[in-house]
Design a protein with these regions (language model features):
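Short carbohydrate-recognition loop motifs
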Residues: 55-76
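Flexible glycan-contacting loops in extracellular carbohydrate-active proteins
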Residues: 195-227
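Secretory/extracellular carbohydrate-interaction modules
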Residues: 70-140
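Bacterial N-terminal signal peptides
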Residues: 14-25
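Extracellular carbohydrate-recognition regions
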Residues: 31-52
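Short, aromatic/His-centered strand-loop micro-motif at the edge of beta-sheets
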Residues: 140-167
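Extracellular beta-strand elements of beta-rich domains used
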Residues: 41, 227-231
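Carbohydrate-binding surfaces in secreted/extracellular proteins
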Residues: 41, 93, 158-197
């Protein structure tokens, strides 16, 4: 016998579960945040707060009111960290791929912000200024690379000497079926561009936050500037 009340109850229950899941995801995307670190990179003392995390040969210095980084020979990437260590963080930075980068290197060069970095592993939001491409990726300690999300022809990605505003958030979910998974959101110029949920978040034990410039191929001579670095944490309120 067909029972309308039972069907209505099942529909209501399904809607409730779906609504709760959506609420959990939107809570991650629109979570209240508190800024705990800000560095405009305007002075020598401020730039000195950025500590090299990886890269065999990396040169650094000032460029106006920014930190300039130059990748050396036999080096694919130069990464620097902020003083902030933690699991659930958001990092933002304004980054430019400089036109002083050799032309053969420019096309494959990327700018990035990194979270949960350590022992060669990390989450990374990478932007390719000349390709208009954005990647959200995960690197493990053994060097293996997993692409969590990729977007091409992103209008918000700017070219040589132009400011790219990168922002990466990595928060572990604390309730629901995805409890313990890491929710990752990548923003370019304030717009959400890439996102993913990583159910293997425990594979990353690093806690460093930072930024980098490099290339998967030849990165020698790649130059980038970094300023307006901000690190935020979830609000407890």
């Amino acid at each position: 016998m067909f029972r309308l009340d039972a069907v209505k109850s099942r529909i209501a229950a399904t809607a409730l579960v779906t609504g709760a899941a959506l609420l959990l995801l939107s809570a991650s995307a629109g979570a209240a945040l508190i800024g705990i670190y800000r560095n405009p990179m305007e002075t020598t003392a401020q730039r000195a707060q950025a500590v090299k995390l990886s890269g065999a040969r990396c040169a650094r210095g000032g460029l106006g009111k920014a930190l300039r980084v130059v990748v050396g020979k036999r080096t694919k990437e130069c990464a620097y960290r902020t003083p902030v260590l933690g699991r659930d963080l958001e990092i933002a930075a304004t980054e430019r791929l400089l036109s002083a980068t050799p032309k053969p290197v420019q096309h494959g060069a990327f700018l990035a912000v990194n979270l949960r970095a350590g022992a060669g592993a990390r989450y990374q939001l990478a932007v390719y200024p000349l390709q208009k491409k954005v990647q959200l990726r995960k690197t493990l300690a053994d060097g293996s690379l997993e692409y969590l999300d990729i977007e091409k022809n992103v209008a918000g990605v700017k070219g040589l000497d132009m400011a790219n505003q990168l922002r990466l958030r990595a928060f572990n979910l604390t309730e629901g079926e995805e409890k313990g998974d890491c929710r990752l959101l990548g923003f370019i110029g304030g717009k959400l561009v890439v996102e993913a949920s990583d159910e293997s978040a425990g594979e990353l034990s690093g806690r460093a936050s930072g930024f980098s410039v490099g290339s998967a191929k030849n990165a020698k001579g790649a130059q980038a500037s970094f300023d307006d670095v901000v690190v935020r944490v979830p609000s407890p309120f």
